[in-house]
Amino acid sequence: MTKDIRVRFAPSPTGHLHIGGARSALFNYLFAKSAGGAFVLRIEDTDQARNVDTATEKLMDSLRWLGLEWDESIDTEAGKYGPYRSMERVDIYKNYIQQLLDEKKAYYCYMTEEELEAEREAQKARGEMPKYSGRDRDLTAEQRAAYEAKGIQPVVRFRVPEGQTVSFHDAVRGEVSFETDGIGDFVIARKDGVPMYNFAVVVDDHLMNISHVIRGEEHLSNTPRQILLYEAFGWDVPKFAHASLILNPDRQKMSKRDESIIQFVEQYKSLGYMPEAIVNFLALLGWSPVGEEEIFSLEELCEQFTLDRVSKAPAIFDTDKLAWMNNQYMKNADLDTVVDLALPHLVASGKLPEQLDEGKREWARRLIGLYQEQMHYGAEIVELTEMFFKEEVDYTEEAKTVLAEEQVPEVLSQFAKELESLEGFFAADIKKAIKATQKATGQKGKKLFMPIRAAVSGQTHGPELGDTIELLGKSVVKARLQAAI
């Protein structure tokens, strides 16, 4: 009988959702949906010292924003698999820890942090890989009582079998093996009885009937420890798939302190990126579709995603590629969506007031629409539209070169004259004025359009000229033409 597909994303509530975590969540979601399975969101909050009060809510908000809706979590009916928060499962873990203690597969360890550190330093000095020596592996009841009489609280360590090889098939990496002699007896419960991650995750994955564990390569070294625990309990081991590392643009392993790249989903949201683009981009970080197509909706990704097309080679986080991809989505979005992404940044930058009357809102809407084709993300609208909110023009070097050409004074003077004669000041009227200027001066093409654009915007490239001039307004354009003549 085939086991139902059940996967989980199990973040620790220590901060915002990192792009690496978002990719893991996405791969799990896509795999579950492609197979008609369940996507479980579990909160691994056993590391109480690192937990942040608002982190769980923010993690869930970021997943919802990306469109990764879960089937089971802390906000759903628990059913037979809940609760979905680790600290609400502590009594469950303690029962299983006691089982290992009773079966002599785990033991109490009384070594202090200072003793452990001294042991590690001595091993390093001898050129050995640091690992727990096993000092307290076989303490007698009298020895344990002596430690406890001194008030020393023990941790619980798992008794790792010696001289064995732990092997498993990874859906991404193929056959993987670890020698138990290099692992050392690892801690499964802290002094306060709260379990460590490697223990809690095994118990949870077993009891929640998780069929596939899909996660990042950084968890690969945890896998042999977890498999040893599965075997100690006599439980079926789930299938594993470890996606490749994500490297920064310099091909270095990403650090959360790396300022060369924006690393948290909430930051991309606040900058005005589209969630569809982030999902599309993250899917291609380590997974390759069949064919050359690069733009996929979430539904299309669900249809195409398979683990056998996930690469074990590191994925490069190409910020230019993400900007390009988001631009593709923005160009094809409806204008109201783009306005929602961009307008808050014009307000936050002080370019526009928070309260806009109907006329000013329509002007802002048209302004944003003017740059919809160019925008890579919402916040970029501030820089793109700078010329609409300044008294003086900042000329680029290219614009200065254009304005120095000999035909420019005649073109600009004639254009100013044609604008004065207009009854209206709409894009269609402005195009007529440009055409009349062409007829009067004999200039056409770049010799005609470039001086006008350079004079009114300070640039030699930009959106449709007639719309640009209309939105700048007659008085502003008149003043800029005079300044450039």
Curated annotation (Swiss-Prot):
Domain of life: Bacteria
GO cellular component, one term: cytosol
Biological process terms in GO annotation: glutamyl-tRNA aminoacylation
InterPro entries assigned to the protein according to its UniProt record, in alphabetical order: aa-tRNA-synth_I_cd-bd, aa-tRNA-synth_I_codon-bd_sub2, aa-tRNA-synth_I_CS, aa_tRNA-synth_I_cd-bd_sf, Glu-tRNA-ligase_bac/mito, Glu/Gln-tRNA-synth, Glu/Gln-tRNA-synth_Ib_cat-dom, GluQ/Sye
Primary location group: cytoplasm
Localization per record: Cytoplasm
Residues where ATP binds: K256
PROSITE patterns registered for this protein in UniProt: AA_TRNA_LIGASE_I (PS00178)
Keywords: Aminoacyl-tRNA synthetase, ATP-binding, Cytoplasm, Ligase, Nucleotide-binding, Protein biosynthesis
Enzymatic class: ligase
Cited Gene3D superfamilies: 1.10.10.350, HUPs
Catalytic activity: tRNA(Glu) + L-glutamate + ATP = L-glutamyl-tRNA(Glu) + AMP + diphosphate
Single GO molecular function: zinc ion binding
Residue numbers covered by motif 'HIGH' region: 11-21
Cross-referenced Pfam families: Anticodon_2, tRNA-synt_1c
Motif 'KMSKS' region: chain residues: 253-257
Enzyme Commission numbers on file: 6.1.1.17
Known role: Catalyzes the attachment of glutamate to tRNA(Glu) in a two-step reaction: glutamate is first activated by ATP to form Glu-AMP and then transferred to the acceptor end of tRNA(Glu).
Assembly and oligomerization: Monomer.
Family membership noted in the UniProt record: Belongs to the class-I aminoacyl-tRNA synthetase family. Glutamate--tRNA ligase type 1 subfamily.
Protein name in UniProt: Glutamate--tRNA ligase
Gene it is expressed from: gltX
